[in-house]
Every structure is written in C-alpha cells, then in structure tokens.
C-alpha cells in the first residue's frame, strides 16, 4: 500500500510517500520539504498569514518532486496533518489532501501531527516497542506512554507554560541571535562552559509533578542574569541555559520510563535534534539500562514522511478513513491520533 502524506502545520511544507507492506513494515520512498523560515526570520517568529501563503505556493512543486522521487503516479491512500498547528496553514494542507483523495478516489486520513513525530523514528530503527515518548518541539513538550503507534497515546505530563522549543527561541532572541533560535543557540552553547552559569531547573522539587515541565522561570532567570551581567560570555549563557533544559527533559523522561517499567525511551520533535539533549539522553539511558531511540535530525523537524509513517501504523491497526467533511483542529490533543 502506497501512502502519500502532506504536512503543513507550521512553516514547513512537507510531502512524504511511504509503502506499508503486508507484514507491517513501513518503507520511506520520498521525503520532500520546502521551508518558509527565511520569510519569517525578519519578523522574529512565524507569521501565520505568510506561512499559509507559502504553503499555497510550495505545495504543488513539492508534491511533484515527491511523486517523481518515489516513482509513483497514484497512491492508495492520502493523509495529512489535521492538527494541531496554525489554523490557516492546516487548512491548506488538509484541503489539498482532500482534493487529491477525491480526484484519485482513494481514502483520506487526517492524522495528528504529534503522533507523526513519534512515528518518524520507525524509518531509522524499525518497529517501535512499548516506549516512553519525550516529545519536544517549538510548541509542545509532552511525556507520553506509547504502547504502540496504532493504539491511543497516553499523556503522562506536559509543560505548564512555555514549551522547550519556545524557550529556546525566546532566549536566542534575548541574546540577539535571531530566529529560529534552536540551531544557532545550540552551536553557540558548544563554545561555552555549561558549568559556568547554573540556571534553575523548573518543576524538579519533591512536591512538583514528576512528569510536568516548566520553562518560563528559566527564561526569566536567563533574562535577569543577562541584564545584571552585561559582560557575561554569551556562549556560557547559552551553554548554561541549554544544560538546564536538557537536564530537566532527560531526568524526567528516564524517571518516567523507570516508573512505568518500560525499557525504551523515544525522543522526538524538533528539539530532539539538539546536540546536548541527544548526548545527555544517551548517557542517562546507558546508566539506567534503557534503550534510547532518536530519529536522525532531518526527521526530527516537520516533514511529510513522519505523517505517512503515522498514517501507515493507524491503517495497519485497522483505523477507518476520515470523512472528507472532517475539519482541521488547531488544538488537537496528542491523545487523539486522528480525526475520523
């Protein structure tokens, strides 16, 4: 079965094509992405209207490249991110997917963007066993219990304020590093001393929810430090901030796996591309006897391949198609795998 999937939840226009075999194996055939990030950079963040217009302009050419790369003329299924995300951006991808579904007379699946991030790892490491999932991106930070990708995902905890990726962008802006902040702040942090400045670790007290996160206080602490120490090394500030984020994320994720008695930790989402998060997660999983799974950096960021993978797993589990009347949902919760 050939599955074509469209991703348009934010500022990347992605088209992925995957093949679902009879034994449940999912093979990636094409992964084409067009980004409008440069158009948003001068505004210091994603502008929804610009993102929607960019999707309209990029979707056709991106679709053509994906079909050519895969050598596919007509897929058996069309899927799309139906939420969560920017309302206008979602509408572009969902409307296009429905149109292709109707034209090709094939089923349509509207699936969850967040589940897609988890499913991306299958391309690199094969079938996913029962896992604790740490999903970290620009707009989301969740700890999840993933029994299988075809079953409902269970949320263990999430951020009570800023997402980890959002904190990265805000601190990068504070340091004058521009947008998007994740990659440039990571690069700067590698030049600094992560022990030179110790920033607070939110929600790590004995009375705090062990599976909840908070990064607002950390962001404020960095701002106050920079204001009171104008001579401080930006690299040290970046390294101290990054260490605080990676420490909390990995500490809570490992604890969740140990609490549930699950032997695999999956880290996914855009922030999973961060070098220190990957390094510290590997170290702590080795110490705890856990198997760590993280997709290659390209599959951590938004793409259509991850949506194709998630749709494939839902189909393999017997999920019904979504009606063409299904509406996109900008606030779709992680526990809803699809809109059916």
UniProtKB/Swiss-Prot annotation:
Q: Which GO terms describe its cellular component?
A: cytoplasm
Cofactors that this protein relies on = Fe(2+)
Enumerate the GO terms in the molecular function aspect: iron ion binding; N(6)-L-threonylcarbamoyladenine synthase activity
Which InterPro entries does the entry mention? ATPase_NBD, Gcp-like_dom, KAE1/TsaD, Peptidase_M22_CS, TsaD
Q: Which SUPFAM superfamilies does its entry note?
A: Actin-like ATPase domain
User: For binding Fe cation, which residues are annotated in this chain's numbering?
Assistant: 113, 117, 302
**Top EC class for this record:** transferase
* CDD domains per UniProt: ASKHA_NBD_TsaD_bac
Sorted UniProt keywords: Acyltransferase, Cytoplasm, Iron, Metal-binding, Transferase, tRNA processing
* Keyword Endoplasmic reticulum attached: no
Q: Which residues bind substrate?
A: 135-139, 169, 182, 186, 274
Q: Name one GO biological process term.
A: tRNA threonylcarbamoyladenosine modification
UniProt xrefs under Pfam families: TsaD
Concerning its family, UniProt says:
Belongs to the KAE1 / TsaD family.
Task: Briefly state the protein's biological role.
Answer: Required for the formation of a threonylcarbamoyl group on adenosine at position 37 (t(6)A37) in tRNAs that read codons beginning with adenine. Is involved in the transfer of the threonylcarbamoyl moiety of threonylcarbamoyl-AMP (TC-AMP) to the N6 group of A37, together with TsaE and TsaB. TsaD likely plays a direct catalytic role in this reaction.
UniProt protein name: tRNA N6-adenosine threonylcarbamoyltransferase
Gene source species: Mycobacterium sp. (strain KMS)
Print the organism lineage. Answer: Bacteria, Bacillati, Actinomycetota, Actinomycetes, Mycobacteriales
């Amino acid at each position: 079965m050939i599955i074509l999937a469209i991703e348009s939840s934010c500022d990347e226009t992605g088209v992925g094509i995957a093949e679902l075999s009879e034994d449940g194996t999912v093979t990636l055939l094409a992964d084409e992405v067009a980004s409008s990030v440069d158009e948003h950079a001068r505004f210091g963040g994603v502008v929804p209207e610009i993102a929607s217009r960019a999707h309209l302009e990029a979707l056709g050419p991106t679709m053509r490249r994906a079909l050519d790369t895969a050598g596919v003329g007509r897929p058996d299924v069309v899927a799309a991110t139906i939420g969560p995300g920017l309302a206008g951006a979602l509408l572009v991808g969902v409307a296009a997917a429905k149109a292709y579904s109707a034209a090709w007379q094939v089923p349509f699946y509207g699936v969850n963007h967040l589940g897609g991030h988890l499913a991306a790892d299958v391309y690199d490491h094969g079938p996913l066993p029962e896992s604790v999932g740490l999903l970290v991106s620009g707009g989301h930070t969740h700890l999840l219990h993933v029994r299988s990708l075809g079953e409902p995902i269970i949320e263990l905890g999430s951020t009570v304020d800023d997402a980890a990726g959002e904190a990265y962008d805000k601190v990068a802006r504070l340091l004058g590093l521009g947008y998007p902040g994740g990659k440039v702040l990571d690069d700067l942090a590698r030049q600094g001393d992560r022990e030179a400045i110790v920033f607070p670790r939110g929600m790590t007290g004995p009375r705090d929810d062990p599976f909840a996160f908070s990064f607002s206080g950390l962001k404020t602490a960095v701002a106050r430090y920079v204001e009171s120490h104008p001579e401080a090394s930006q690299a040290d500030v970046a390294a101290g901030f990054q260490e605080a984020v990676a420490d909390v994320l990995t500490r809570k994720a490992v604890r969740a796996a140990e609490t549930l008695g699950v032997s695999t930790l999956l880290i996914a989402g855009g922030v999973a591309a961060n070098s220190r998060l990957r390094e510290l997660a590997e170290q702590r999983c080795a110490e705890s006897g856990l198997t760590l799974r993280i997709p290659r950096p390209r599959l951590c960021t938004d793409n259509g391949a991850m949506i194709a993978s998630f749709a494939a797993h839902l189909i393999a589990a017997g999920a019904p198609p979504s009606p063409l009347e299904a509406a996109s949902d900008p606030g779709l919760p992680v526990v809803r795998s699809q809109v059916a």
